[in-house]
């Protein structure tokens, strides 16, 4: 059993929003680092599922740094768009992962499919896959799914990514309006983390 105190773990992402959320979920005795601390860029994500892409990142950064790595792959699926964007969610923001651009594209696409979409309940879900690599002989993985709907407009400036347009099931606020404490009670990433925190 490794000594947990002052143990380094690398969060396998170059997305500042993800790094912050995962850091806040991890036990406080870890020293948290990121690929930027090692001058590493993200690997090519060519998996066809969230779990596969999460594993690709966790394995890559763990091998490169010789450290334990926890990596996230997540995305938004929208029923009306045939579950797009799914694993390609971040790519809708272009090379710079501009989520303002991505959100604009979501609304444009919804209007193209159904010009009256704002009068309907557009079902969607956030999915998060987490992988811990380098802690055990085999990777540790989990999946968190939160159902909800797409808001009629962008609301809130908290969180990151698609948070301002996603309203979780049985709630009235978007993730972009929620405090971090409230979001973690309804969040796909926190849900996935709960399944693997016992290993940490």
Where do the protein language model's features map onto the residues?
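Anionic-ligand binding patches
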Residues: 2-12, 16-200
């Amino acid at each position: 059993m490794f000594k947990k105190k002052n143990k380094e773990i690398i969060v396998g992402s170059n997305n500042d929003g993800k790094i912050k959320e995962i850091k806040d979920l991890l036990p406080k005795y870890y020293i948290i680092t990121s690929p930027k601390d090692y001058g590493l860029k993200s690997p090519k994500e060519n998996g066809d599922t969230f779990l596969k892409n999460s594993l690709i990142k966790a394995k890559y950064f763990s091998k490169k740094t010789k450290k334990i790595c926890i990596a996230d792959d997540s995305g938004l699926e929208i029923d009306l768009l045939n579950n797009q964007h799914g694993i390609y969610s971040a790519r809708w923001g272009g090379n710079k992962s501009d989520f303002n651009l991505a959100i604009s594209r979501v609304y444009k696409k919804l209007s193209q499919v159904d010009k009256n979409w704002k009068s309907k309940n557009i079902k969607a879900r956030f999915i998060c896959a987490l992988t811990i690599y380098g802690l055990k002989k085999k990777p540790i993985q989990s999946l968190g799914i939160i159902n909800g709907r797409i808001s009629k407009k962008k609301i809130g400036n908290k969180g990151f990514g698609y948070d301002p347009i996603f309203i979780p099931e049985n709630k009235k606020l978007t993730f972009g309006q929620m405090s971090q404490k409230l979001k973690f009670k309804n969040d796909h990433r926190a849900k996935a983390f709960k399944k693997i925190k016992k290993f940490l």
